[in-house]
């Protein structure tokens, strides 16, 4: 294998971003097309789904069967489009870049915008009048009282009302069944026909058990839809081939027709069959569920047997492998989420965040890096696009420094991708959560940064979002919030003047954390039970270990592991705020600044007006997370332990537990832009820090900041975290690559779980905000995924600009100097 890796790496050196047009004209043309198309709303799925459910409304057919029929009918009847010269058949929607409508989730949120969504300033999504009328008169009225949020409202109106306040908690099940990694390897080995036959046999075997029989019947129906869809692709490609005059396009259509005639119906035999089968499965999962964070998984492991067989036989050249793999990258990027104007403030600029995982160790704990790993890293280098979200697992003792350096070189070249994940910490964390070591070693990254064993853990890792700043506000205001009136929301836990010791304040904060968790968990479980009743998932279930053995849908607990994720917003800001409270209000020997908690809260609530000296002290002298200050080290660890103790042992609706995480997408910027001041010295309406990243513009060495994060107990962050680091631009020279890789390895050996990078300076980002026309495709790392800078909301752009910047060579902090300073 080592000789083959060397051979492949040498061949890959021929390909660079600068010679893409010359060496790989197909990928260059696909990149240009991808960059030129506008996001367009696609209503086809919503029409088919709604029509079928209307027709079967009073049929007495179980919902598991009705929904399987509806999805199967859509897959069987949907139109087949070829928008470009991509080597793969199948597409998420009928548009070159489509935003599918999921009316059973939050699709109705665009109802007020049907006439304006095409022309809005922030990330317009094209919707023609005919389609808008169909949504307005035919689709949306049916779902007005049937969407999952409205079904939940019928059961728990009070907690659903709080959900809509946005700042108490957010339950993402209102929007999606997602954030998990199917085992597409099952399809590559068995074929859809194999799964269908298994369903038929088990349906007959369990004909005396209605629940199991219905489940297997739903799988059978859904699998037939997958077969029909791939057959339709084959037929349409054959028609196109017969009428095509361009010889290259004709050959491509003929190849697609041949491939899709065989897969995914039958087991894959070669690389292009395996890649196209996997992609069609992804499309079909999106047809059943929403297009958010459904992850292809460990592609260099799943596809490797097919790649190496073809490569060694001479049937597959490196150029072929790059073109096929690059075609998959563009297919994965063929869709975006449907986002209403109001949500642009929180989620603007995000893609569908399908994560691809490379490298790490295999199920035996040995080095899993192979020739295909390097091919896919090269594709990532050549194609700087938002999706897929590529991630590199790294095991400091099993993987080679050569692999580590190649990942580092890729990041320095494309300036954002991939992220690094620490196999030692992450595997042990999953084992600590009850997964077997073999299963834990086979983890893939989910969505932004979350972890889960491939096809074994239906992790629903974005289930709950907890805004920690709201919990802090309640602890400082006797249980009140800014949106629920003068009375305590859950419980009155004391006014600031009641806290004569720090521990009394801490107890109030801990109690508000527990009460928020209790209510968020209750609502999440209600959503989950409604998913079980109204939104069964036979396609996704068939591509997991567990459901076919148990005769139980994935959302009914069919998977081997059944966790839910709870991520936290504003951890660094809240940590700094609690440090400031302890320092200023409860540290007797602090001679620089002392005041009562009541006085501090009053100053904060007034946004520090008339308290400039206090504001300056809190910003510049109070203990800060990320500086190794003993108070900050203690408070950061106590916060981690508190959330873990509150959530980890709580049971979800599938019998699993809640895994704590710290990643924020763009929520930290959106929420921060509408939130009041904090005791940390942060003024009102300033973005929060991202993920678990220390607050920006703290003058400290990079290694100091990294060590503060690495010292946190990752066993108690089983949902993972996002750490964002910004380096001054540096060329991918041998010296810089080595330095980059060694810093990552040192951080991991100290216990760091994950880290991702932006290789940008303040000036470039400021210019990109001021002159967006000059930077139309500037790719940046947000908090767990990448985005095009120009598509982000203003708050998120500002947060990226002000993120602390470090010099790679020295590790020195580079302060932000604004004009006039």
Question: What name fits each language-model region?
Answer:
Residues 2-216, 248, 252-255, 259-821:
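Conserved catalytic cores of very large enzyme subunits
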Residues 237-253:
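Short, Lys/Glu-rich amphipathic helical modules
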Residues 217-228:
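Extended non-globular scaffold/tether segments
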Residues 228, 232-235, 239, 255:
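Extended, non-transmembrane alpha-helical coiled-coils
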């Amino acid at each position: 294998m080592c000789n083959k890796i060397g051979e492949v790496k040498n061949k890959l050196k021929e390909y660079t971003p600068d010679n893409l047009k010359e060496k790989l004209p197909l990928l260059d043309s696909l990149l240009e097309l991808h960059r030129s198309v506008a996001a367009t709303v696609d209503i086809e799925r919503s029409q088919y789904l709604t029509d079928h459910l209307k027709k079967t409304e009073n049929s007495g057919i179980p919902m598991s069967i009705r929904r399987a029929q509806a999805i199967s009918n859509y897959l069987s009847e949907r139109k087949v489009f070829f928008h470009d010269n991509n080597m793969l058949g199948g597409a998420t929607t009928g548009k070159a870049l489509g935003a599918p409508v999921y009316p059973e989730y939050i699709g109705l949120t665009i109802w007020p915008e049907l006439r304006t969504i095409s022309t809005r300033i922030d990330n317009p999504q094209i919707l023609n009048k005919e389609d808008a009328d169909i949504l307005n008169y035919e689709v949306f009225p049916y779902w007005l009282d049937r969407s999952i949020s409205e079904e939940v409202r019928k059961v728990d109106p009070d907690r659903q009302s709080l959900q809509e306040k946005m700042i108490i908690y957010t339950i993402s099940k209102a929007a999606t069944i997602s954030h998990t990694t199917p085992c597409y390897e099952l399809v590559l080995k068995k074929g859809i026909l194999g799964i269908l036959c298994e369903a038929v046999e088990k349906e007959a075997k369990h004909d005396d058990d209605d629940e199991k029989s219905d489940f297997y019947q739903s799988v059978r129906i859904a699998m037939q839809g997958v077969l029909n869809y791939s057959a339709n692709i084959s037929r349409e490609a054959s028609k196109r081939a017969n009428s095509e005059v361009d010889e290259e396009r004709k050959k491509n259509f003929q190849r697609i027709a041949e491939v899709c005639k065989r897969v995914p119906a039958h087991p894959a035999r070669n690389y292009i069959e395996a890649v196209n089968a996997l992609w069609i499965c992804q499309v079909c999962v999106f047809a059943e569920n929403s297009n958010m964070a459904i992850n292809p998984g460990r592609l260099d492991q799943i596809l490797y047997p097919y790649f190496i067989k073809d490569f060694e036989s001479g049937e597959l050249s490196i150029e072929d492998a790059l073109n096929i793999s690059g075609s998959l990258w563009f297919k994965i990027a063929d869709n975006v989420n449907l986002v209403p104007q109001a949500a642009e403030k929180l989620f603007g600029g995000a893609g569908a965040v399908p994560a691809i995982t490379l490298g790490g160790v295999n199920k035996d704990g040995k080095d899993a890096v192979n020739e295909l790993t390097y091919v896919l890293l090269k594709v990532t280098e050549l194609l700087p696009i938002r999706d897929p979200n590529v991630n590199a697992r790294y095991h400091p003792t099993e993987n080679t420094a050569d692999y580590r350096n190649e990942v580092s070189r890729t990041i320095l070249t494309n300036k954002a991708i991939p992220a690094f994940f620490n196999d030692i910490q992450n595997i042990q964390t999953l084992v600590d959560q009850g997964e077997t070591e073999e299963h834990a070693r086979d983890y893939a990254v989910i969505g932004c940064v979350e972890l889960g064993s491939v096809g074994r853990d239906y992790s629903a890792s974005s289930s709950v979002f907890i805004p920690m700043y709201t919990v802090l506000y309640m602890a400082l205001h006797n249980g009140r919030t800014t949106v629920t009136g003068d009375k305590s929301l859950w419980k009155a836990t004391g006014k600031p003047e009641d806290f004569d010791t720090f521990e009394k304040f801490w107890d109030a904060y801990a109690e508000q954390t527990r009460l928020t968790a209790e209510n968020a968990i209750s609502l999440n479980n209600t959503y989950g039970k409604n998913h079980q009743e109204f939104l069964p998932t036979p396609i996704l279930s068939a591509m997991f270990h567990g459901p076919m053995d148990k005769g139980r849908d994935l959302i009914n607990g069919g998977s081997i592991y059944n966790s839910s994720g709870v991520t936290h917003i504003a951890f660094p800001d809240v940590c700094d705020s609690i440090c400031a409270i302890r320092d200023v209000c409860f540290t007797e020997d602090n001679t620089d600044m002392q005041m009562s908690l009541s006085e501090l809260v009053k100053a904060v609530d007034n946004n520090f007006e008339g308290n400039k000296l206090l504001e300056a002290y809190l910003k510049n002298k109070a203990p800060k997370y990320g500086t190794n200050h003993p108070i900050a080290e203690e408070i950061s660890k106590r916060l981690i332990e508190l959330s873990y103790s509150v959530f980890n042992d709580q049971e979800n609706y599938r019998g699993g537990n809640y895994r704590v995480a710290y990643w924020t997408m763009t929520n930290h910027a959106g929420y921060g832009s509408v939130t009041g001041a904090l005791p940390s010295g942060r003024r009102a309406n300033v973005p929060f820090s991202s993920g678990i990243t220390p607050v920006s513009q703290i003058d400290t060495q990079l290694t100091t900041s990294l060590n503060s994060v690495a010292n946190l107990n990752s066993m108690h962050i089983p949902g993972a975290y996002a750490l964002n680091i910004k380096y001054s631009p540096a060329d991918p020279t041998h010296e810089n690559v080595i330095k980059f890789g060694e810093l990552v390895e040192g951080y991991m050996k100290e216990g760091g779980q994950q880290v991702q990078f932006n290789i940008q300076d303040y000036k470039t980002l400021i210019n990109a905000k001021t002159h967006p026309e000059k930077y139309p495709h500037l790719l940046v790392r947000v908090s767990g995924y990448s985005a095009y800078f120009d598509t982000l909301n203003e708050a998120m752009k500002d947060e990226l600009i002000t993120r602390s910047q470090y010099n790679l060579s020295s590790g020195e902090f580079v302060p932000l100097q604004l004009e006039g300073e």
